[in-house]
Swiss-Prot record:
One of the primary rRNA binding proteins, it binds directly to 16S rRNA where it helps nucleate assembly of the platform of the 30S subunit by binding and bridging several RNA helices of the 16S rRNA. Forms an intersubunit bridge (bridge B4) with the 23S rRNA of the 50S subunit in the ribosome. It comes from the Bacteria. One of its GO terms (biological process) is translation. CDD domains: Ribosomal_S15p_S13e. SUPFAM superfamilies: S15/NS1 RNA-binding domain (SSF47060). The keyword Oxidoreductase does not apply. NCBIfam families: S15_bact. This is Small ribosomal subunit protein uS15. Pfam families: Ribosomal_S15. Part of the 30S ribosomal subunit. Forms a bridge to the 50S subunit in the 70S ribosome, contacting the 23S rRNA. GO terms for molecular function: rRNA binding; structural constituent of ribosome. Signal peptide: none annotated. SMART domains: Ribosomal_S15.
Length: 89
Protein backbone atom coordinates (compact mmCIF):
# COMPACT_ATOMS: atom_id res chain seq x y z
CA UNK A 1 0.00 0.00 0.00
CA UNK A 2 2.85 2.39 0.65
CA UNK A 3 5.50 3.26 -1.87
CA UNK A 4 9.11 2.18 -1.59
CA UNK A 5 11.90 4.63 -0.87
CA UNK A 6 13.39 3.97 -4.31
CA UNK A 7 10.09 4.74 -6.05
CA UNK A 8 9.64 7.90 -3.98
CA UNK A 9 13.17 9.04 -4.87
CA UNK A 10 12.45 8.38 -8.55
CA UNK A 11 9.26 10.44 -8.39
CA UNK A 12 11.09 13.29 -6.67
CA UNK A 13 13.80 13.18 -9.33
CA UNK A 14 11.24 13.19 -12.17
CA UNK A 15 9.06 16.01 -10.88
CA UNK A 16 11.49 18.22 -8.94
CA UNK A 17 12.45 21.64 -10.25
CA UNK A 18 15.88 21.57 -8.59
CA UNK A 19 18.32 19.25 -6.85
CA UNK A 20 16.83 19.48 -3.37
CA UNK A 21 13.24 20.19 -4.34
CA UNK A 22 10.98 17.80 -2.44
CA UNK A 23 8.22 20.16 -1.35
CA UNK A 24 6.97 21.72 -4.56
CA UNK A 25 3.32 21.02 -5.38
CA UNK A 26 4.31 18.93 -8.41
CA UNK A 27 6.41 16.55 -6.30
CA UNK A 28 3.79 16.30 -3.56
CA UNK A 29 1.00 15.63 -6.06
CA UNK A 30 3.07 12.98 -7.88
CA UNK A 31 3.76 11.13 -4.61
CA UNK A 32 0.12 11.34 -3.54
CA UNK A 33 -0.99 10.07 -6.96
CA UNK A 34 1.31 7.06 -6.62
CA UNK A 35 -0.08 6.28 -3.16
CA UNK A 36 -3.67 6.68 -4.42
CA UNK A 37 -2.96 4.32 -7.32
CA UNK A 38 -1.52 1.72 -4.95
CA UNK A 39 -4.49 1.96 -2.59
CA UNK A 40 -6.94 1.69 -5.48
CA UNK A 41 -5.27 -1.56 -6.55
CA UNK A 42 -5.46 -2.75 -2.93
CA UNK A 43 -9.24 -2.28 -2.95
CA UNK A 44 -9.62 -4.57 -5.96
CA UNK A 45 -8.89 -7.50 -3.64
CA UNK A 46 -9.87 -6.04 -0.25
CA UNK A 47 -13.20 -4.38 -0.95
CA UNK A 48 -14.34 -4.23 2.67
CA UNK A 49 -11.25 -2.51 4.06
CA UNK A 50 -13.06 0.60 5.26
CA UNK A 51 -10.21 1.78 7.47
CA UNK A 52 -7.90 2.12 4.46
CA UNK A 53 -10.72 3.60 2.39
CA UNK A 54 -10.89 6.50 4.83
CA UNK A 55 -7.15 7.03 4.34
CA UNK A 56 -7.66 6.97 0.58
CA UNK A 57 -10.31 9.67 0.80
CA UNK A 58 -7.97 11.77 2.91
CA UNK A 59 -5.19 11.40 0.31
CA UNK A 60 -7.55 12.31 -2.54
CA UNK A 61 -8.70 15.39 -0.63
CA UNK A 62 -5.12 16.45 0.06
CA UNK A 63 -4.19 16.01 -3.60
CA UNK A 64 -7.26 18.00 -4.66
CA UNK A 65 -6.24 20.86 -2.37
CA UNK A 66 -2.72 20.92 -3.81
CA UNK A 67 -4.09 20.83 -7.36
CA UNK A 68 -6.44 23.72 -6.60
CA UNK A 69 -3.53 25.69 -5.15
CA UNK A 70 -1.38 25.03 -8.21
CA UNK A 71 -4.21 25.97 -10.58
CA UNK A 72 -4.80 29.20 -8.68
CA UNK A 73 -1.11 30.17 -8.66
CA UNK A 74 0.11 29.00 -12.06
CA UNK A 75 -2.32 27.34 -14.44
CA UNK A 76 0.29 26.36 -17.04
CA UNK A 77 2.14 24.21 -14.49
CA UNK A 78 -1.20 22.74 -13.41
CA UNK A 79 -2.17 21.76 -16.96
CA UNK A 80 1.25 20.23 -17.62
CA UNK A 81 1.13 18.22 -14.41
CA UNK A 82 -2.35 16.73 -14.84
CA UNK A 83 -1.49 15.79 -18.42
CA UNK A 84 1.78 14.20 -17.31
CA UNK A 85 0.17 12.25 -14.46
CA UNK A 86 -2.90 11.28 -16.45
CA UNK A 87 -5.31 12.73 -13.92
CA UNK A 88 -8.69 13.56 -15.34
CA UNK A 89 -9.98 16.96 -14.46
Amino acid sequence: MSITAERKTALIKDYAKGNKDTGSPEVQIAILTERITNLTAHFKTHGKDNHSRRGLLKLVSQRRSLLDYLKRKEEARYRTLIERLGIRR
